[in-house]
Design a protein with these regions (language model features):
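Residues in well-ordered beta-strands of folded domains
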Residues: 6, 22, 48
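A short, exposed loop/beta-hairpin motif centered on an aromatic-Gly-Thr core
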Residues: 16-24
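Short acidic, gly/pro-rich beta-turn/loop elements at beta-sheet edges
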Residues: 15, 31, 55-57
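Compositionally biased, intrinsically disordered low-complexity segments
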Residues: 12, 21, 57-59
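Short amphipathic, charge-patterned alpha-helical segments
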Residues: 28-35
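Short aromatic-glycine-(Arg/Gly/Cys) micro-motifs in beta-strand/loop hairpins
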Residues: 1-16
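Short, charged/polar surface micro-motifs in flexible loops or helix N-caps
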Residues: 26-27, 53
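Short, mixed-charge low-complexity intrinsically disordered segments
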Residues: 35-70
Length: 70
């Protein structure tokens, strides 16, 4: 399953998207995310299953680019 990972460096800062990881379940995503994004001493890190993200703007499906008329 694909997870989107968000983190912050200091308490009180906003969470920022730091990337994504593939993990078989919620338990292992914690270890995978910590290992993958270990370049900072994060105050907080959260992982959200990509399928659980709610579309706020835009289309659900990516649109095809316009075709050339030439």
């Amino acid at each position: 399953m694909k997870y989107e990972v968000f983190a912050r460096i200091r308490a009180g800062d906003e969470l920022i998207h730091v990337g994504n990881v593939d993990a078989p379940d919620d338990r292992l995503v914690k270890s995978y995310a910590r290992t993958t994004f270990d370049e900072e001493d994060w105050d907080r890190m959260v992982a959200v299953p990509r399928d659980e993200l709610i579309e706020v703007t835009g289309n659900q499906k990516a649109e095809s680019p316009p075709r050339s008329t030439q």
